[in-house]
Amino acid sequence: LKLPSFPIGQIYGLSFNDDNNRIAMTLNSSRSPGDVYVLNIKNKKLTQWTKSEVGGLDTDNFVSPELVRIKSYDDLEISGFLYLPRDKKGPHPVIISIHGGPESQFRPGFSSRFQYWINELGCAVLATNVRGSAGFGKTFVKLDNGFNREKSVKDIGAFLDMIDKDNRLDSNRIGVYGGSYGGYMVLASMTH
């Protein structure tokens, strides 16, 4: 079954209709906090049924991230999502965002905070998935357990190296943000 292209985001809440010829789903993307879409299986047409309220803001100004994959200090592949200001000259200051958990994961979902930083402050945002993040397999999620916790801090160092090599980003203007476990990682990153 060849499907139409979907907006980049998270799909959840799948439900078939009684005749099993349509699938309803919720899509949360970087440009929308959650809308209902229906896919007609016969004609493969995807229809958006709702348009989420975002406080009167123009969602055309919201940006979608690009997936970045890098090698960490020990050649382990780690990833994140890089959000860049639209139509603004760089290099951009960068806010590195570290998720809580540690067994959580950044996905390209809606974040009013990120969109504010990008559109109002002109900052790029790098939402990181260091070792120990969920969604990359059982082995990956255990890579920061116990005495290995410091390895995830070194992953932030690898992202700093990436920023330094990317001419769209200003490696002299970097902030680090996180709450809960992400807050621990902010403090640990700043002391290394």
Language model segments and positions:
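Short glycine-enriched nucleophile-adjacent loop
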Residues: 183-192
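Hydrophobic beta-strand positions that form the internal "hydrophobic ladder"
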Residues: 23-24
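Residue-level detector of Asp-centered blade-edge/turn motifs that repeat once per structural unit
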Residues: 18-19
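Short coil/turn segments at the loop-to-beta-strand junctions that recur within blades
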Residues: 6-11, 53-57
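A flexible loop/linker signature enriched in serine peptidases of the S9 family
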Residues: 7-9, 27-35, 106, 132
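Beta-propeller blade-edge and WD-like acidic-aromatic loop motif
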Residues: 1-2, 28-49
